[in-house]
Amino acid sequence: MVWTQLHAEIHRTIRSRHLFEGNKRLLVAVSGGQDSLCLIKLLLDLQPKWGWELGIAHCDHRWRADSQANADHVKNLAENWGVSFYLETATKPVNSEATAREWRYQALSAIAQAHNYQYIVTGHTASDRAETLLYNLMRGTGADGLQALTWQRPLTENILLVRPLLEITRKQTEQFCQEFQLPIWEDSTNQDLKYARNRIRQELIPYLQANFNPQAELAIAQTAELLQADVEYLERTAQQLKEEAMEWEVGEEFLSSSSPSSLLLRLNRQVLQKAPLALQRRVMRQILQEILADAPNFEHIEKLTALITAPNRSQTDPFPGGAIAQVQGNWIILRNGERRSN
């Protein structure tokens, strides 16, 4: 085996960031593109050092005419490498990027669960991280959206998603594939400029590189890395603040299905008033995530946060689903909208 600088870098990253334990089962998501081929080749070469059992999973979205041929191509690669292969095909074509991503992670989790894989590994790179940060920035987001692709995150209670290539650019994965003559399957949808992410990749980032910083891609990805550490700290601190400020009391019906129907949730305003605005907002977002069916937006978070310093008996307009929040002295009370006071 030829040991390259990229092999050494990924080996070092896995060890220093504690991405995997040795002698575990890793399910590698392989589309057939350059990033996933680079990933599986690196893991196969590192396998003797770590004692992993590797499997390859391919998800066929059925949104290209050549998708079946693409799946067969990946299956043949897996057979040539002597690696278990798993194929999941969408029952109907998946038409949006968001829907495709959600279906893909569900499919990968199901395969991993059925075949006892502890890790799902994807080939997301620093280039993907930069694109995701820019995409979220233009949609409007906080630091949580700007941290853009984390090294690890749990998909289920016992399956961890891992992205070992987040410090590697797409240019590097292309060079690696060329060096080892890996047969890349070109995905024609990556060239389709109707997708916002493709416009960022094909037009915006090259413009930034040509006119502002040749290393713009890495610089933006490094910003995401710095923000990730900040977000993790703020989330932990906000969780502690929430636990300090939050109380349950017997009273009117509270909306959270996970709570006993006889309990009301109330928040101590004096505790929250001592905290900086950044933590106040995070506490309110965490609370709203528990009681709303969909993710809270900026307006929802702001109107609940405003009650921390609002006059007595101030209250919000109803949130989606009917919940309202009202100030009662030193407390913010979350209650059913039908109980709204006049």
Swiss-Prot record:
It is found in: Cytoplasm. ATP binds at S31, G32, G33, Q34, D35, S36. Its main location: cytoplasm. Pfam families: ATP_bind_3 (PF01171), TilS (PF09179). GO terms for biological process: tRNA modification. The keyword Phosphoprotein does not apply. The keyword Transit peptide does not apply. InterPro entries: Rossmann-like_a/b/a_fold, TilS/TtcA_N, tRNA_Ile_lys_synt, tRNA_Ile_lys_synt_N, tRNA_Ile_lys_synt_subst-bd. Keywords: ATP-binding, Cytoplasm, Ligase, Nucleotide-binding, tRNA processing. One of its GO terms (cellular component) is cytoplasm. GO terms for molecular function: ATP binding; tRNA(Ile)-lysidine synthase activity. It is an enzyme of class 6 (ligase). It catalyses: cytidine(34) in tRNA(Ile2) + L-lysine + ATP = lysidine(34) in tRNA(Ile2) + AMP + diphosphate + H(+). Its EC number is 6.3.4.19. Ligates lysine onto the cytidine present at position 34 of the AUA codon-specific tRNA(Ile) that contains the anticodon CAU, in an ATP-dependent manner. Cytidine is converted to lysidine, thus changing the amino acid specificity of the tRNA from methionine to isoleucine. The N-terminal region contains the highly conserved SGGXDS motif, predicted to be a P-loop motif involved in ATP binding. This is tRNA(Ile)-lysidine synthase. It comes from Nostoc sp. (strain PCC 7120 / SAG 25.82 / UTEX 2576).
